[in-house]
Amino acid sequence: MPEFELYVEDRQVVTPGELLARGQVIASEGTYTSGDEVYSKVTGLVDIDGRRIRVIPLAGPYRPSPGDFVVGIVEEVKFSSWLIDVRAPLPAILHVSNALEEEVDLIETDLSRYYRPGDVITAVVREVDPVQRVELSLLEDDAPTRLGRLQGGQVVEIDPVKVPRVIGRKGSMIKMLKRVLGCDIVVGANGRIYVRAREEPKKERELLAVRAIREIERRSHLRGLTDWLKANLKRLSRW
């Protein structure tokens, strides 16, 4: 007899309580087990990778976790910190000790010389307390890209649970977007995405990138999305 049985297909939309698999599988996020059976906990897309099975929700708020890479917007400058909008229930706090390697005289220094309201930054979630207060850091060595202020470009926001589709399996979608559009694209776990064109015509490239990201969000439940989008981007691009 097989070691496990699957009752759904990869990328299939499932609902809470739906039987996904039975046997020796690894039940991951969005699932629960009863005996040797695995069920869906949410309405979402099945993701099967070998023995591992998970369900990616079709919609939901950003739930911060330590280690998350996020794109934030500075809301307020305090005496020794900044308040950052990361799309969490409460503003995140960025202490000066987690933002600057240099020592700063807080009596003499206005922190807005470093970051001011409206600035877009990349950061890593350092800590989340029981009431979902988030503490950020810009001093993490293992971040996927440089941390700190982002300049120029455009910012687009999507449902945070659609972020895995923008990235794609093994990074396939995001790599294709960067290559075809000639853009740097920074994807935050909080569903905020920064786009900046590397080549002319920059405005057109950025607008098409934003449009593409919106299409991914809208069509995230479809199979073959990467190939479909690649074909359409090549048709729509005029450079």
UniProtKB/Swiss-Prot annotation:
Origin superkingdom: Archaea
Any one GO biological process: exonucleolytic trimming to generate mature 3'-end of 5.8S rRNA from tricistronic rRNA transcript (SSU-rRNA, 5.8S rRNA, LSU-rRNA)
GO cellular component, one term: cytoplasm
Gene3D superfamilies hit by this protein: 2.40.50.100, K Homology domain, type 1, Nucleic acid-binding proteins
Keywords from the UniProt entry: Cytoplasm, Exosome, RNA-binding
Domain S1 motif residue range list: 67-139
GO molecular function annotation: poly(A) binding
InterPro entries: Exosome_RNA_bind1/RRP40/RRP4, KH_dom, KH_dom_type_1, KH_dom_type_1_sf, NA-bd_OB-fold, Rrp4, RRP4_N, RRP4_S1
Subcellular location: Cytoplasm
Residues covered by the KH domain: 151-217
Purpose of the protein: Non-catalytic component of the exosome, which is a complex involved in RNA degradation. Increases the RNA binding and the efficiency of RNA degradation. Confers strong poly(A) specificity to the exosome.
Subunit-level organization: Component of the archaeal exosome complex. Forms a trimer of Rrp4 and/or Csl4 subunits. The trimer associates with a hexameric ring-like arrangement composed of 3 Rrp41-Rrp42 heterodimers.
Family, similarity comment: Belongs to the RRP4 family.
Protein name: Exosome complex component Rrp4
Taxonomy of the source species: Archaea, Methanobacteriati, Methanobacteriota, Methanomada group, Methanopyri
Gene that this sequence comes from: rrp4
